[in-house]
């Protein structure tokens, strides 16, 4: 999957990834340059075909994540790692390999699918930090997108505490967005439930399963001693114009960050994929051509017209910034947690320092 994505990548990219959500949408009204968006629909088609024939061993993959047991992995990988460490004179701590890049990430929704209303589902996402949740052997671990374990705690997820972890097979792996304000892990997707992997299942089935099983776990949505963080499933909606208008006029129990558009047939594939699209709510009208109701979600922020210029300027010093952050992290044990999208500006729109990578 990764090789195919790289082979099909076009020249547009302010970051290293094609249509990365770390950069602004190429079709913001103030910047209607003709970027290469035709490939996005073609890459969607090819990825859907590829996943029909490509069946990875996700049973063992999920087990390794749950048990942190990598026995049997290629010995050459370890030798390569050892050689790299011997050649590396930089004392900065390397990123962990095992739990990094395990989440399925989106691209900006540039090329609007012709079957958007029939074959796509939209999820309203809260402001927060993406987290890989692994509940296994009586403990629950939270990992960043980069693979750092930032918290371990008990939870009422299957396998997440000593009381309900009856067997080693009772493990759960979730894709979540953590809201520090609400002390809540909003469940975006499910990769494994009670030892049963769902990587090869279609999005509509994964969402159905997730929203059916989460309410069955009594107390999971409450903050208690044994469950110090709430786990709440995010709802999904059809992508018809009528549904989108209704969604954008709703009130949500969290601050809304943006919208994720999932193709119904998408399997859960770690890494960026054009089969998951990302838009900020105020972009729906311009990008999708849908008449939206006036309201807080659809009001364009002041920085919308300056976002592209800010990102470009910010990227010039990105490598230096990353080196400083990594060095600082290795010294004090704190690591940069990556946002789902561009955080709100805390300074005037013309300041390039106010934007961070997602």
Curated annotation (Swiss-Prot):
The record marks 106, 145, 278 as: Interaction with m3G-cap structure. The modification Phosphoserine is found at residues 75, 351. Residues 1-39, 69-89, 315-358 are annotated as: Disordered. InterPro entries: Importin-a_IBB, Snurportin-1, Snurportin-1_N, Snurportin1_C. Its main location: nucleus. GO terms for cellular component: cytoplasm; NLS-dependent protein nuclear import complex; nuclear cap binding complex; nuclear pore; nucleus. Residues 210-329 are annotated as: Necessary for binding to the m3G-cap structure. Residues 1-160 are annotated as: Necessary for interaction with XPO1. Gene3D superfamilies: DNA ligase/mRNA capping enzyme. Keywords: Acetylation, Cytoplasm, Nucleus, Phosphoprotein, RNA-binding, Transport. Signal peptide: none annotated. One of its GO terms (molecular function) is RNA cap binding. Residues 1-65 are annotated as: Necessary for interaction with KPNB1 and m3G-cap U1 and U5 snRNP import receptor activity. Residues 128-130 are annotated as: Interaction with m3G-cap structure. The keyword Repressor does not apply. Residues 7-22, 30-39, 349-358 have a biased composition (Polar residues). Residues 315-341 have a biased composition (Basic and acidic residues). The modification N-acetylmethionine is found at residue 1. It is found in: Nucleus; Cytoplasm. GO terms for biological process: cytoskeleton organization; protein complex oligomerization; protein import into nucleus; protein tetramerization; RNA import into nucleus; snRNA import into nucleus. Residues 11-73 form the IBB domain. Belongs to the snurportin family. Functions as an U snRNP-specific nuclear import adapter. Involved in the trimethylguanosine (m3G)-cap-dependent nuclear import of U snRNPs. Binds specifically to the terminal m3G-cap U snRNAs. Component of an import snRNP complex composed of KPNB1, SNUPN, SMN1 and ZNF259. Component of a nuclear export receptor complex composed of KPNB1, Ran, SNUPN and XPO1. Found in a trimeric export complex with SNUPN, Ran and XPO1. Interacts (via IBB domain) with KPNB1; the interaction is direct. Interacts with DDX20, IPO7, SMN1, SNRPB and XPO1. Interacts directly with XPO1. Its interaction with XPO1 and binding to m3G-cap U snRNPs appears to be mutually exclusive. Can form homomers. This is Snurportin-1. It comes from Rattus norvegicus (Rat). The lineage of its organism: Eukaryota, Metazoa, Chordata, Craniata, Vertebrata. The gene is Snupn.
């Amino acid at each position: 999957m990764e090789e195919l994505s790289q082979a099909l990548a076009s020249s547009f990219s302010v970051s290293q990834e094609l249509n990365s959500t770390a950069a602004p949408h190429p079709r913001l009204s103030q910047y209607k340059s003709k970027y290469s968006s035709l490939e996005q629909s073609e890459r969607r088609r090819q990825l859907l075909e590829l996943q029909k024939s490509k069946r990875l061993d996700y049973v063992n993959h999920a087990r390794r994540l749950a048990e942190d047991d990598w026995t049997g992995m290629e010995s050459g990988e370890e030798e390569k790692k050892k050689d790299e460490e011997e050649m590396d004179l930089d004392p900065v701590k390397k990123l962990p390999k095992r739990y990094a890049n395990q989440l399925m990430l989106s691209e900006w929704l540039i090329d609007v699918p012709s079957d958007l209303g029939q074959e796509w589902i939209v999820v309203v996402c809260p402001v927060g930090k993406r987290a890989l949740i692994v509940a296994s052997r009586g403990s629950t671990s939270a990992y960043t997108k980069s693979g750092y374990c930032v918290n371990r705690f008990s939870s009422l997820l299957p396998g997440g505490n000593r009381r309900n972890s009856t067997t080693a097979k009772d493990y759960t792996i979730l894709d979540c967005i953590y809201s520090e304000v609400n002390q809540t892990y909003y469940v975006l997707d499910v990769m494994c439930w009670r030892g049963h992997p769902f990587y090869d299942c279609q999005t509509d089935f994964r969402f159905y399963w997730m929203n059916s099983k989460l309410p069955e776990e009594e107390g999971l949505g409450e903050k208690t001693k044994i469950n110090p963080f709430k786990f709440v499933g995010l709802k999904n909606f059809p992508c018809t114009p009528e549904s989108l208008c209704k969604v954008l006029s709703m009130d949500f129990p969290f601050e809304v960050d943006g919208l994720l558009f999932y193709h119904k047939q998408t399997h859960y594939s770690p890494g960026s994929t054009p089969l998951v699209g990302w838009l900020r709510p105020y972009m729906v009208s311009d990008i999708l051509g849908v008449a939206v109701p006036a309201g807080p979600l659809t009001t364009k922020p002041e920085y919308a017209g300056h976002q592209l210029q800010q990102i470009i300027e910010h990227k010039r010093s990105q490598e230096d910034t990353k080196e400083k952050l990594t060095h600082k992290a290795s010294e004090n044990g704190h690591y940069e947690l990556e946002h789902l999208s561009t955080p709100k500006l805390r300074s005037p729109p013309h300041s390039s320092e106010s934007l961070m990578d997602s």
